[in-house]
């Protein structure tokens, strides 16, 4: 379960960082 969460997080992280950079 934890491994699955980390895989999902690894996929979402770049998108979240991209959105955060666009806002600044």
Curated annotation (Swiss-Prot):
It is found in: Secreted; Target cell membrane. Expressed by the venom gland. One of its GO terms (molecular function) is toxin activity. InterPro entries: Antimicrobial_4. Its main location: secreted. GO terms for biological process: defense response to bacterium; defense response to fungus; killing of cells of another organism. It comes from the Eukaryota. The keyword Hydrolase does not apply. One of its GO terms (cellular component) is other organism cell membrane. Keywords: Antibiotic, Antimicrobial, Fungicide, Membrane, Secreted, Target cell membrane, Target membrane, Toxin. The keyword Membrane applies. Pfam families: Antimicrobial_4 (PF08024). Belongs to the non-disulfide-bridged peptide (NDBP) superfamily. Medium-length antimicrobial peptide (group 3) family. Ponericin-W subfamily. Has a broad spectrum of activity against both Gram-positive and Gram-negative bacteria and S.cerevisiae. Has insecticidal and hemolytic activities. May act by disrupting the integrity of the bacterial cell membrane. This is U1-poneritoxin-Na1a.
């Amino acid at each position: 379960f934890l491994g699955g969460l980390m895989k999902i997080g690894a996929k979402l992280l770049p998108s979240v960082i991209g959105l955060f950079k666009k806002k600044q």
